[in-house]
C-alpha cells in the first residue's frame, strides 16, 4: 500500500544520500569545528562553500538520473515475487517526489553541521521545527488530492523550507558568509 511504497521510496532516497551527503557532512564537521574554534572564518567559509558546491554538483545530476531512470532503479533494487509491477509503479511516483528534494536534504546535511561546528545548535533546530510544521501542514493539504505522492511532495517542500531558513540564518551570522 501507500505506507509501504513511501517507506521503500524513502529508503532508496536515503541510500543515495548516505553514499555522498552523509559522507561529506561527516568528513567536514571536524575540520569546520577546528576552524571555528581557531576563529579562522575565512577558511571555514571557503570549506563550507566548497562542500555546498560539491553537494550541488553531485545532487543535481543524480536527481535528474533518478527522475528519468527511477523505474529501473526501483525494479533493480526491490522487484521480486512479492514486489510486483504494481508495487514498482506505486513506489515510482513517490520516489520522484522524494528525489526532487534530494538537493535540499543534501545541503541541509552540510549546512546544519556548520552551525554545530560553531556551537550554535539553536538555529538549525529552529529551522528543523519550522520545516517539521510545514511538512505536517503540506502533508495534510496534499494527501487527499495526491495520496502518497502528496506526502512525498510535502517532505520535499519541508526540506526546501529548512534549506531556505538555514541560508537566512547563515546570512545573519557574521562568521558565515556563504
Task: State the predicted function of each range.
Residues 1-178:
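Membrane-embedded alpha-helical bundles of multi-pass transporters/translocases
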Amino acid at each position: 500500500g501507500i505506507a509501504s511504497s513511501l517507506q521503500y521510496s524513502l529508503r532508496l532516497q536515503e541510500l543515495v544520500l548516505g553514499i555522498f551527503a552523509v559522507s561529506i557532512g561527516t568528513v567536514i564537521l571536524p575540520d569546520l569545528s577546528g576552524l571555528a574554534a581557531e576563529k579562522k572564518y575565512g577558511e571555514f567559509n571557503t570549506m563550507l562553500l566548497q562542500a555546498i558546491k560539491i553537494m550541488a554538483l553531485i545532487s543535481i545530476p543524480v536527481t535528474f538520473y533518478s527522475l528519468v531512470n527511477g523505474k529501473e532503479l526501483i525494479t533493480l533494487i526491490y522487484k521480486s515475487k512479492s514486489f510486483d509491477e504494481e508495487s514498482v509503479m506505486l513506489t515510482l511516483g513517490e520516489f520522484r517526489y522524494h528525489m526532487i528534494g534530494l538537493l535540499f536534504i543534501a545541503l541541509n546535511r552540510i549546512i546544519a553541521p556548520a552551525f554545530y561546528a560553531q556551537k550554535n545548535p539553536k538555529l538549525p533546530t529552529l529551522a528543523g521545527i519550522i520545516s517539521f510544521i510545514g511538512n505536517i501542514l503540506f502533508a495534510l493539504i496534499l494527501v487527499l488530492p495526491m495520496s502518497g505522492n502528496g506526502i512525498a511532495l510535502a517532505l520535499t517542500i519541508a526540506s526546501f523550507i529548512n534549506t531556505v531558513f538555514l541560508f537566512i540564518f547563515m546570512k545573519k551570522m557574521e562568521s558565515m558568509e556563504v
